[in-house]
Regions:
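Glycoside hydrolase catalytic-domain context in secreted enzymes
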Residues: 1-619, 623, 637-641, 646, ...
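A generic signature of intrinsically disordered, low-complexity regions enriched in glycine/proline
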Residues: 47, 368, 507, 572, ...
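Terminal connector regions
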Residues: 618-665
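Charged, amphipathic alpha-helical linkers/stalks
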Residues: 646, 653-723
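Long, low-hydrophobicity ectodomains and other hydrophilic envelope-associated domains
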Residues: 689-806
Length: 806
């Protein structure tokens, strides 16, 4: 094992700077002459994605086979941190077997809005639940000697303009909603690394944000690991290093090294800043490499498939079961309809896409079950194209069955990294099919596949609804067992399902092309809004049915937590997820009507009862006092609410809590809309009162951070031409129903990323020449690009020669 302090004394400043950026798409820079190995990083929120051949960060090229577990959005419905730890351990084992040192996950972004195209990679709208689950994944991954890298830190809630948007959020909302999940993950999971997000937060890029990285992450939480940029996410490398960012990825080449050297020479940063970052990076490199050297080069694929199936079982959510249609009895004549039954949708698209070791198919599992499968019909084109013949054949089959199992859902391109959803609806051809089938056979079980919320105005057309989410490669077996009663669904929703998208508090301001993203709703995301505003929803946070019933009784409560008795009052074994919410009536602060502060899973046989305890931690009663700039507690009476969902509260006890608050955070501000939870249309004036300063105006500037999708603002024919070509290609891909993820990434990419993602082929000086061209200085810009290109080639060659010691 290398001694980092001694090693730092041996390295030249240039060598030190070179170590702080990647060498290839997923590899760090090694220096064998100093005993510093090169290590692999790999995507892997729900399955490893190591690309043995040509690598990319969007999941476009195939990867080495790995187990595809249910996505984070699915596993979150299990409310089982221990299960997350098991999945994490399997991910870590597969990473070690494939010689991957850092697993880039789990994803901890808060689900501010259900249209986020990447919601399937994230756990919940609630930071407490998300943090607890993420901590489990992290502990599991790192139990195998591999480093976890939770992401994306922070306030990154949309894919639109994700590399160049500025999240404008007040400090209390930042702390209580968008950072608490990361805080729990860091303090309880102890990750060796963390990934910064692409976006700016209140005017400063997250990767160089001193408030986020130094004051909060490293200062308050005690994080001492490596902060890794998202791929191409570095804006000012030197400022990032100074303010706590460790490793710039993927492969910016020698220009990045020269940027740091120049910053040291100018006094912008010091060599001590660079040493501090290497003291975070090098132990990670040495420790993980040593663990990988001792790890076996294979894993038990069958055992991991079995774990993936159990995870899918625990993640299923029964949303409707009219007349106890489910479970289906042996011998029931069933018609299986829907393309997803034969061609499963089990994961999302983008950088998390896994090349699965195997994939189970629901139709096959149903045929192998005790049901009498009388036939299968595709029913609809999964990409939305109307097809009357498919619908007619499905209806003819449905007339012959006792029960119809209809598999519906979102297609592969509806949810993906790189683009946000345009609506919450299922394809119209699927809804038409459901209505047509219901007309000939009302006994319909809908099995729904999606990574996030969908609107369900069609709910009356089915008797049962089983939410399969994106259940991973073994999800089909879990669904079949749930339909037949071998598995009793126990999952509960980790996000609210609204009646309509218009009800979502951020609906009016989500995924616009504006530079600034204004978090006007403040604390009120998800159930925090719906319960406070008393707005009806389709399915509330924490909701999920079972084939049995549970009774809650004999509650006792104090500041430490609650205890109660849970009894299985039904006829089959089952698992209940008991939820603890905290509420404060007549608060002097504005706050959500109730907030999740604890939960517990309990598995009971028929008639069995068990006494359970749910403890409260230091986050149970705290709020961020923006005036005192610290966590405080408002004293007084609180309600501890125990229930089966945020709306189904079974027991309540009141306790008195001693307060610490000495100054009212909002005594000089009129914030009536926030006290009422009336945040659908927050005015500029009210949002500025919440922020405590004027709303920043995001102006389009022709500089390094101009995105390719904004080149129509350029004063250059070349810029307009590039913009026009990209726009035409992108629009064409949308019309085909298959948005091109690569073009989408380029469209939202700032010019500076050209210098961060081309392995040194393009320097920042060349980017500055391009900017001059776009500003209208056509000749000077072209000359600058040519000059900087020649200079870059020469300097890169000289630097590589020095670094190789030649």
């Amino acid at each position: 094992m290398q001694n980092t302090e001694l090693l730092l004394k041996k390295l030249t400043l240039e060598e030190k700077c070179a170590l702080l950026s990647g060498a290839e798409t997923f590899k760090t820079r090694g220096m064998p002459e100093h005993g510093i190995p090169q290590i692999w990083l790999s995507d892997g929120p729900h399955g490893l994605r190591k690309q043995a051949g040509e690598s990319d960060h969007l999941g476009l090229n195939p990867s080495v086979p790995a187990t595809c577990f249910p996505t984070a959005s699915a596993v979150a419905n299990s409310w089982d941190a221990a299960l997350g730890e098991e999945i994490g351990a399997a991910l870590g084992e597969e990473a070690a077997a494939q010689e991957v040192s850092v697993v880039l996950g789990p994803g901890l972004n808060m689900k501010r809005n259900p249209l986020c195209g990447r919601s399937f990679e994230y756990f919940s709208e609630d930071p407490y639940l998300a943090g607890k689950l993420a901590a489990g994944y992290i502990r599991g991954i790192q139990s195998m000697g591999v480093a976890a890298c939770p992401k994306h830190f922070a306030v990154n809630s949309q894919e639109t303009r994700r590399m160049a948007s500025d999240s404008i959020v007040d400090e209390r909302t930042l702390r209580e909603i968008y950072l608490t999940g990361f805080e729990i993950a860091v303090k309880e999971g102890h990750p060796r690394s963390i990934m910064s997000s692409y976006n700016l937060v209140n005017g400063t890029y997250a990767n160089e944000n001193k408030h986020l990285l130094m004051e909060i992450l490293r200062g308050e939480w005690g994080f001492d690991g490596a902060v890794i940029t998202d791929w191409g996410g570095s804006n000012d490398h030197a400022l990032g290093v100074k303010n706590g960012s460790t490793l710039e990825m993927p492969a910016p080449g020698g220009d990045s090294v020269r940027e740091l050297l120049a910053a040291v020479e100018s006094g912008k940063i010091t060599e001590s800043d660079i040493d501090a970052r290497l003291s975070e990076l090098l132990p990670l490199v040495f420790d993980t490499k040593a663990a990988l050297d001792a790890a076996p080069r294979e894993f038990d694929a069958a055992a991991h498939h079995a774990l993936a199936r159990r995870a899918a079982e625990e993640s299923l959510v029964l949303l409707k079961n009219e007349g106890a249609l489910l479970p289906l009895a042996a011998g029931t004549k069933v018609a299986v309809i829907g393309d997803f039954a034969k061609n499963p949708r089990y994961q999302g698209a983008g950088s998390s896409m896994v090349n699965s070791t195997q994939v189970d198919v629901l139709l096959d599992k149903l045929i192998d079950s005790e049901l009498n499968v009388i036939g299968y019909q595709q029913g609809f084109d999964r990409h939305g194209k109307p097809d009357a013949a498919l619908q007619k054949s499905a209806c003819e089959l449905a007339t012959q069955a006792d029960t119809v199992i209809l598999c519906m859902g979102l297609d592969e391109i509806a949810e993906s990294e790189g683009l946000d959803r345009s609506n919450l609806r299922l394809a119209q051809n699927q809804l038409d099919l459901l209505q047509a089938v219901a007309a000939v056979n009302p006994k319909i079980v809908v099995v729904l596949y999606s990574g996030s919320v969908v609107e369900t105005p069609w709910l009356d057309n089915c008797q049962a609804l089983l939410y399969a989410a994106l259940g991973g490669q073994a999800g089909a077996g879990a669904v079949a067992d749930a339909l037949t009663g071998k598995v009793n669904p126990c999952g509960k929703l980790a996000e609210t399902w609204p009646l309509a998208y218009a009800d979502v508090p951020s609906a009016a301001d989500f995924a616009t092309r504006r530079k600034t993203v204004e978090y006007r709703e403040g604390l009120y995301i998800g159930y925090r809004y719906f319960t406070t505003a008393e707005k009806a929803v389709r399915f509330p946070f924490g909701y999920g049915m079972s084939y049995t019933t549970f009774a809650y009784s004999d509650m006792a409560a104090d500041e430490e937590g609650v205890s109660l008795t849970v009894t299985n009052t039904g006829s089959v074994a089952g698992t209940e997820i008991v939820q603890l919410y905290v509420a404060k009536k007549n608060s002097e602060l504005f706050r959500p009507a109730k907030e999740l502060k604890g939960f517990a899973r309990v598995t009971l046989a028929p008639g069995e009862k068990q006494r359970i305890t749910i403890t409260l931690d230091d986050k149970a009663f705290r709020f961020w006092n923006v005036k005192a700039n610290r966590w405080e507690i408002e004293g007084g009476e609180y309600e501890l609410l125990v229930g089966a969902s945020v709306e189904d509260i079974r027991l309540c006890e009141k306790i008195s809590v001693h307060g610490t608050a000495t100054v009212h955070p909002y005594e000089d501000r009129n914030l009536d809309c926030y006290y009422k939870g009336d945040v659908l249309h927050v005015s500029d004036a009210d949002f500025e009162k919440l922020l405590g300063h004027p709303i920043p105006k995001g102006k389009t500037k022709i500089d390094r951070n101009l995105t390719l999708g904004e080149l129509n603002h350029a004063r250059s024919p070349l810029g307009w031409l590039v913009w026009l070509v990209l726009t035409i290609l992108l629009d064409a891909s949308y019309k085909r129903g298959k948005p091109d993820l690569n073009i989408l990434f380029q469209y939202n990419m700032p010019l500076r990323a050209l210098a961060k993602m081309t392995n040194g082929a393009i320097s920042m000086g060349m980017v500055d020449g391009i900017v001059m061209e776009l500003q209208g200085f056509w000749i000077l810009g072209l000359v600058r690009v040519i000059y900087e290109a020649i200079k870059n080639v020469v300097l890169n060659a000289q630097m590589e020669k020095r670094l190789r010691g030649a």
